[in-house]
UniProtKB/Swiss-Prot annotation:
This is UDP-N-acetylglucosamine--N-acetylmuramyl-(pentapeptide) pyrophosphoryl-undecaprenol N-acetylglucosamine transferase. Belongs to the glycosyltransferase 28 family. MurG subfamily. The keyword Cell wall biogenesis/degradation applies. Its main location: membrane. The lineage of its organism: Bacteria, Pseudomonadati, Campylobacterota, Epsilonproteobacteria, Campylobacterales. The gene is murG. It is a peripheral membrane protein. Gene3D superfamilies: Glycogen Phosphorylase B (3.40.50.2000). It is an enzyme of class 2 (transferase).
Length: 341
């Protein structure tokens, strides 16, 4: 049996694609990936051995387009969707798992049109446009925010290395793989104060910003463990006692799984303000500060007064393992029932 995983564009979608593919591979099931030439899909999976085959279509987003551009993009998606017939026929695809994002549209639409079971995973607290459109046609809709709730699929390494934080000794700034400019600028402003009070600083700034950030810290004579981007990010997260971060789905759940308390500064221009609502889900154990209110004085005060022990204990109790296993179990059970009909 071959299962197609589709979707991506950004790390939040692609992380779930990777984790679910790994779980399917453990069961001996064949998987193919259908993504886009745009976004980060090729960066993540072009050379990956996780999938039996990968396809990258020339799909692009529709949400922010208007007028004739929007109409043309919709026609392009329909054309790409029709083009999926050869891929599905070649691999005898029996089910499609969509992780959302614009690159999920062609394969997900083709699945619906041809009554191939569609399973959707939504990472955010505000449902993405494509997922919202296709939810009614899906065999199952998996979410950690909406009923019936499923545990979030998380890379096991974050759970295995989780520890209770008892005080703040090390502060980590997470700018993401692309580097969030606001987080980077905030880190630079806070670094002298943090260093003065004896805090160790870890700053993940994005590859494109690494040289510039290194020069700034060198000029200010501030000792910072600076990372552009690392596939071993969990090692740095494990060292942190408190993180200053955006609240994209994967980042939020990975920090929670490692029991790292966080000050979340949601990206204000995220679709549907979903980063804010993601963070609200962990409101009991984190601090949420709107970007317009996130000046260095306020953030420094939060760092100094954060009860990280209580938050860390709460996070460790909240996050459950085997999220991916439970979802794949459910998918397989649904497909077995489908075969009996």
């Amino acid at each position: 049996m071959t299962i197609a995983i589709t979707g991506g564009g950004t790390g939040g979608h692609l992380t779930i694609a990777k984790i679910l593919a790994y779980e399917l591979k453990k069961r001996g099931l064949k998987t193919i990936f259908i993504g886009s030439t745009n976004g980060q899909d090729m960066l993540w999976f072009e050379n990956s051995v996780l999938f039996d085959e990968k396809y990258f279509l020339k799909s692009s987003g529709v949400v922010n387009k208007k007028g004739i551009s929007r109409i043309l993009s919709l026609f392009k998606i329909l054309a790409l969707s029709f083009g999926c017939r050869k891929i599905f026929a070649k691999h005898d695809v029996k089910a499609v798992i969509s992780v959302g994002g614009y690159s999920s549209a062609p394969a997900a639409f083709w699945a619906v049109a041809n009554k191939i079971p569609l399973f959707i995973h939504e990472q955010n607290a505000e449902i993405g446009k494509i997922n919202a459109l296709l939810k009614r046609f899906a065999k199952r809709f998996y979410s950690s925010y909406f009923e019936p709730k499923f545990d979030y699929p998380i890379d096991e390494i974050f759970l295995k290395t989780a520890r209770i934080r008892r005080e703040v000794k090390t502060v980590m700034f997470l700018g993401g793989s692309q580097g969030a400019n606001f987080i980077n600028e905030l880190a630079v402003k806070l670094a002298p104060h943090l260093a003065e009070f004896g805090y160790k600083i870890i700053h993940q700034c994005g590859e494109a910003n690494e040289a510039k950030m290194r020069e700034i810290y060198k000029k200010e004579s501030i000792n910072v463990e600076l990372i552009g981007f690392s596939k071993m990010l969990h090692k740095f997260v494990e060292s942190a006692d408190l993180c200053i971060s955006r609240s994209g789905a994967s980042t939020l759940w990975e920090l929670a799984a490692n029991a790292v308390p966080a000050v979340f500064i949601p990206f204000p221009y995220a679709a549907g303000d979903h980063q804010y609502y993601n963070a609200k889900f962990l409101e009991q154990f984190c601090k949420i500060v709107r970007q317009s209110d996130a000046d260095e004085e306020r953030i420094f005060s939060i760092i100094q007064n954060f009860d990280v022990k209580a938050a860390s204990i709460g996070l460790k109790k909240l996050i459950k393992p085997d999220g991916a296993k439970k979802i794949v179990d459910d998918i397989i059970e649904n497909l077995k029932n489908e075969d009996k009909k």
